Amino acid sequence: EPWGLYLWWLNLNGAFYFNGAFLGDGGRFSEPIARNWNKPFFFVLPASLWKPGDNEILIRLHSDPGWGILSPIEVGPVSRLRPDFELRRFLQVDLTRGLTITLLVASTLVLAVWWRRRHDPQYFWFGLACLMWGVFSTYLVLRDPPMSGPVFRWLSHLALDAWAVCMALFVHRYLGIRRPRQEKLLGLLLVGAGTLTALPALIWQGYAFMVTHTLTFMIIAWQALRVFGHWRKGRWREHGLLGIALGALLLAGLHDLLLALPLDNLPSELARIRLKYHFILLHLAAPIVLLFLTGHLGRRFADALYDAETLNRELESRVEA
């Protein structure tokens, strides 16, 4: 049975060699570097390349300064390694790409509804939230960005912070809350996040992202508490589904924050498990939750149209009478 080489993930790009023979790579090594940080690699090791005794695997790793990382590799029978590789690639690349496209279409539809109902800004903020997550998701699946890598990374992470702000403003409109000072503060936080992460000379960008994304998590938690407060008043049908959705985002976000903590002193076996398990849950949870809420808003919109048409018919019948 043929053997293969399986790499869980790396940052940002790599070229693979076996006993001096080229196996493949992830694309361009010049700027903008091909971005393969969210995909696994798998190569079959041809029987003709094996030799008695020691065999050499060489991986050329290329990344932006400070961002390079290489997970442990697995070498073994193809029948054992390929299923795990295929599942990981499906979840991290194929499914994420499909959800991103679907979410961008959904954001267009929601914004189109807002254009017809501009007196109801909840559709605007929710459509913009879907759009911001769609922009961030392109960072997960787009290998060759149309701009420099550092700029692409900065814009994508800023879109993630903007997503949280838009979600907060959507929740405010959904619940009928008006908090002008708090909403201005959210805008200032977004400006501050963009400024902090754009100054790598002041603080390493990875640490800056951890700070801003922790604030993102706190914003979502804040809105979940607000929805829970309204739900306790007995308005389950209106607020229960939104509360469940925000709760799912909170759990996924907490998982990802814990996964991103710099735990350098872990025992080697635990560190190996952590590297292999490095699966960002919010990448799947957020678009699924947003699509779920899109359907929920669509139902509310249809109910509102039905009620309006029913009222118009009743008024017309009274006028005719």
Language-model features, listed with the residues they occupy:
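Solvent-exposed beta-strand/loop surfaces of large extracellular or lumenal domains
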Residues: 21-41
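Interfacial "cap-and-anchor" motif at the non-cytosolic start of specific transmembrane alpha-helices
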Residues: 132-314
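Aromatic-lined ligand-binding clefts that engage carbohydrates, nucleic acids, or primary amines
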Residues: 1-19, 57-59
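First transmembrane helix
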Residues: 86-117, 210-232, 287
